[in-house]
Amino acid sequence: MSDLSHIRNFSIIAHIDHGKSTLADRFIQMCGGLAAREMEAQVLDSMDLERERGITIKAHSVTLHYKAKDGKTYQLNFIDTPGHVDFTYEVSRSLAACEGALLVVDAGQGVEAQSVANCYTAIEQGLEVMPVLNKMDLPQADPDRVKDEIEKIIGIDATDAVACSAKSGMGVDEVLERLVQTIPAPTGDIEAPLQALIIDSWFDNYLGVVSLVRVRQGRVKKGDKILVKSTGKVHLVDSVGVFTPKHTATADLKAGEVGFIIASIKDIHGAPVGDTLTLSSTPEVEVLPGFKKIQPQVYAGLFPVSSDDFEDFRDALQKLTLNDSSLQYMPESSDALGFGFRCGFLGMLHMEIIQERLEREYDLDLITTAPSVIYELELKTGETITVDNPSKLPDVSSVADFREPIVTATILVPQEHLGNVITLCIEKRGVQRDMQFLGSQVQVRYDLPMNEVVLDFFDRLKSTSRGYASLDYHFDRYQSANLVKLDVLINGDKVDALALIVHRDNAAYKGRALTEKMKELIPRQMFDVAIQAAIGGQIIARTTVKALRKNVLAKCYGGDVSRKKKLLEKQKAGKKRMKQVGNVEIPQEAFLAVLRLDS
């Protein structure tokens, strides 16, 4: 289809659970993308993980052909986007390839935080945003209130928002009709030199690197020689095509279209996301503005359970980095866990997802240590160093000043939940900067220590405000703080992977909570296991996992007390000997116990 006016590129912005993947399924069904027998719920959420958690993690693309009421057939290139705060970079990448976006709002729940943030991203990138009210078949749907909220909070006209129910299929054709009319056609010149933006890439064991691209200018076909602008390397195109949602090869990809290019690139970093592709004959083509590089906020150590898996683990991380450009890693070794990698993530959900993807897709068994942020230390020698791993902290006596990262957090919350949110921020050592009332919502700005934000702040903010509060934060500065290193000792030995950096005021509480938690998680042994929390040389908390004991008196029917004493003494001596040589196996849950401390 050479006519650009018949192409529509759009993505769907929606909060978690407002039904965007179901709506996508309906689009595919109505446009005949899949036969009825191939249709299954959430076609686009192809990762098992996405289905189980009911969230979209990776952006997916589908090309559909829709015959509109005006008799013309339109090519719809639809890019699915994630809704969770940790994956906002995926959203910005998807939006860069579109001219418009559908803002899908649950007619029962109304506008929620994440869609507000993503919607602003879309408006900043100059996209046409079209509101859609979903779940109209539910008894609690209240379209008028929700339209009012869209106008007040996001500031776009929602008077004639399309109402539909993706589950029952009601009104979905109306959404497609409106979409064709509202969203502008792409601009671009098919005869100009090729200019294509890489939205996403992933590694296929047989095909090499597969890149999902949005062609801005020109065309690309099989047999062309393409140049990757950032690496300067030239590759021969093996095939181009689109997902319908099945992998379908086409003759070429033209300006305005979204599809995949396979050019047997074997080097994992051969086609980085956000890069520009052009033909080798026109190397002077301008580089398209890519995406800003995302800085990791949270660092954690990942270690293979068996040291033989280290090489496989490194290969898996390399392949995953191609698909997820925000993941960073460097080698690390630990006394307790052996060799592994220190990885940087965007947030806690991102960390869990990466770990699960490594375990499932690459069949690895991993142990994760507690996450930490980057601290700045000024030593007494006058030197300044940064530390992202508590076990690498220098001796306290050599540190002149300990600084922690502070973030400026902007929280949008309905007025009735404001009190709970303020209480939470104070508990997390926050300092209020300002407060503004916007209609029924309040915007508060707080300076919060980053290590308080990354652990469980987002989850607790959601639960304390019934899911209505939204959070946006960015790094501001380093600030001096009274921080200490909390060590965990098991049977008198320090376990480096369990060390934590905490504020001195919270240290005693954290130490007690952590030892109690560890007591539940460490399996009982044949001898007593002492779990202690210490700051420097001072023990601040202790619990004991009691030994399992066999009833050695079971065989004594009555009999003399000295006989029983002898058996008990013998057992005691055996336990003592065992304790000297016994090793305690620490399960994976214990390393993550730190996260579950509801401070």
UniProtKB/Swiss-Prot annotation:
- Keywords, ordered alphabetically: Cell inner membrane, Cell membrane, GTP-binding, Hydrolase, Membrane, Nucleotide-binding, Protein biosynthesis
InterPro entries cross-referenced by the UniProt entry: EF-4 (IPR006297), EFG_III/V (IPR035647), EFG_V-like (IPR000640), EFTu-like_2 (IPR004161), LepA_C_sf (IPR038363), LepA_CTD (IPR013842), LepA_IV (IPR035654), P-loop_NTPase (IPR027417)
Q: Which reaction does it catalyse?
A: GTP + H2O = GDP + phosphate + H(+)
Keyword Lyase found? no
What is the main EC category here? Answer: hydrolase
List the coiled-coil residues.
Answer: none
Domain tr-type G, which positions? 5-187
Please give one Gene Ontology molecular function term for this protein.
GTP binding
Does this UniProt record's set of keywords contain Protein biosynthesis?
Answer: yes
Query: Please, one GO biological process term?
Result: positive regulation of translation
Write down the CDD domains for this protein, in alphabetical order.
Answer: EF4_II, EF4_III, LepA, lepA_C
Say which domain of life the source belongs to.
Answer: Bacteria
What membrane topology is annotated for this entry?
Peripheral membrane protein
Q: Which EC number(s) does the record attach to this protein?
A: 3.6.5.n1
The protein's predominant localisation is membrane
Q: Name the positions where GTP binds.
A: 17-22, 134-137
What is the annotated signal peptide range for this record?
none
One GO cellular component term noted in the UniProt record for this chain: plasma membrane
Where in the cell? Cell inner membrane
The family annotation for this protein states:
Belongs to the TRAFAC class translation factor GTPase superfamily. Classic translation factor GTPase family. LepA subfamily.
Its job: Required for accurate and efficient protein synthesis under certain stress conditions. May act as a fidelity factor of the translation reaction, by catalyzing a one-codon backward translocation of tRNAs on improperly translocated ribosomes. Back-translocation proceeds from a post-translocation (POST) complex to a pre-translocation (PRE) complex, thus giving elongation factor G a second chance to translocate the tRNAs correctly. Binds to ribosomes in a GTP-dependent manner.
Record protein name field: Elongation factor 4
Species name: Ectopseudomonas mendocina (strain ymp) (Pseudomonas mendocina)
Lineage of this protein's species?
Answer: Bacteria, Pseudomonadati, Pseudomonadota, Gammaproteobacteria, Pseudomonadales
Task: Quote the gene name from the UniProt entry.
Answer: lepA
